[in-house]
């Protein structure tokens, strides 16, 4: 009986949160110690995803099915209009004597994180596309306006210069981006904002 009541209370909290913040989600927002995810406006978090601890999600972000974002031993920050696609894993590096600040995970604005990407304690600039299945390790810094090809491995502490296409295992700089490709980075982010809004509108229509 008490378990059933607890589920009803949790569902009510989620319903109120979705009404106020226009968030499409279930009770997959979880605390870690004193930290609870901070969610911006018009955010979509799929019900099958998990967001834990010190995670700061800005306005118009979309988190698609089966994503795990774990801000437990450091923080995760995701900038406006970025999208985290299906099956991706986002985590951080703890603080230690070796590196007192650890490695948070910082994602800029208008970033597209493709399906099944792994991001661990790295920093990503604005208008970046991380191709499907890519892995970015601790201490990686990616500049603005960068494309990373599918299946790439970006080794620990590597820096990717702004304005280039990178690809490979380990990743290598291939060539400068064309103007069309630069525009495509913004197009991708805007498309995911549009699709996210369609999901939110659909969810609002079925709310009692």
PLM-predicted stretches and their roles:
Residues 21, 26-39, 72, 78-107, ...:
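Glycine-rich hexapeptide-repeat left-handed beta-helix
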Residues 26-63:
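N-terminal segments that cap or nucleate solenoid repeat domains
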């Amino acid at each position: 009986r008490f378990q059933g009541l607890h589920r009803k209370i949790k569902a009510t909290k989620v319903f109120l949160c979705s009404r106020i913040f226009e968030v499409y989600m279930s009770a997959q927002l979880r605390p870690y110690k004193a930290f609870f995810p901070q969610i911006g406006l018009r955010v979509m978090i799929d019900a099958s995803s998990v967001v834990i601890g010190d995670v700061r999600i800005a306005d118009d972000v979309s988190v698609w099915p089966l994503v795990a974002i774990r801000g437990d031993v450091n923080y995760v920050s995701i900038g406006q209009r970025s999208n985290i696609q299906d099956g991706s894993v986002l985590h951080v590096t703890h603080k230690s004597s070796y590196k007192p600040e650890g490695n948070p995970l910082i994602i800029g604005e208008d970033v597209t994180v493709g399906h099944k990407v792994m991001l661990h304690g790295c920093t990503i600039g604005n208008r970046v596309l991380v191709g499907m299945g890519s892995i970015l390790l601790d201490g990686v810094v990616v500049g603005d306006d960068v494309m990373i090809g599918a299946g790439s491995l970006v080794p620990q502490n590597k820096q990717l210069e702004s304005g280039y296409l990178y690809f490979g295992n380990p990743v290598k700089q291939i060539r400068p981006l064309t103007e069309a490709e630069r525009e495509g980075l913004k197009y991708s982010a805007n498309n995911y904002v549009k699709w996210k809004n369609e999901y939110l509108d659909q969810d609002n229509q079925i709310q009692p």
